[in-house]
């Protein structure tokens, strides 16, 4: 019910498919990123910039973003608010 979420540089994802937004600094997440690359499930949306957030989807795809996790989370929240406002207008 989140719709499309901007993850930076004109890239958008389906908010309903995201199950986690995490900071990429830990070793387990670096391994997860490497495994996804080997399996062909890594999507790099950083445009060569530093990875600041890793988004994990329900299909086990790993999406790299150059936007901070907090910023992406705020965009999810804003998207939900906009959807609720539109639903209230219809009711």
Swiss-Prot record:
State the Pfam families in the record.
RemA-like
Signal peptide start and end residues: none
Which InterPro entries does the annotation name?
RemA-like
| PANTHER family on file | REGULATORY PROTEIN SSL2874-RELATED, REGULATORY PROTEIN TM_1690-RELATED
Q: Which family does it belong to?
A: Belongs to the RemA family.
Protein's name in the database: Putative regulatory protein Tlet_1629
**From which organism does this entry originate?**
Pseudothermotoga lettingae (strain ATCC BAA-301 / DSM 14385 / NBRC 107922 / TMO)
Q: What is the lineage of its organism?
A: Bacteria, Thermotogati, Thermotogota, Thermotogae, Thermotogales
